[in-house]
Amino acid sequence: AKAAYDHVERSLSSADGGEDNKYNHQRYFRTALAFKKFWEHEDIRSFLCMLNKHPKRNDKFLDINVLYYLFELITERLCDVRKTVCLLDGEGYDDKKSDIAKKLTNGEKLFVISVYQTIGAGQNLQYDIPDAVRDSLIQTNSWNRSTKKDFDAIYLDLPTNLTVNIW
């Protein structure tokens, strides 16, 4: 835990964020906790992690390499987190979305990171049900059985700017 804390602290030391640094620091650990839940639960094969900012290489507020480091600590380097974690951003969005759907349909376990603005309203992230899961599904209603499924789990990081305060 100390190694993780120190690594995040070093990555944020160059950021002149003041009070925002506390938020950025906590965002790293909230995201790592979401990944930890994904990693610990075998029944979670697809996890959508929605943040307010895309993690990018060498970004002083949310560096993807720092997240990879935290995720490697969680997995104890038992897997290549760069193959398990997918970034769904605006650059090549349709190709990335298609690739993610294909991997999930093939039964791969994926942790997908995106932001609210990229996914946007009306985007359908469902994917074809993997064969390994199809036979274990139980239909609980009279709706037509679908060949698509949603993500198994989702994490929403402080979606405060998406809702309107009416009081």
Give each language-model segment a name.
Residues A1-G120, Y127-S136, W143-D150, T160-W167:
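Conserved C-terminal RecA-like helicase domain
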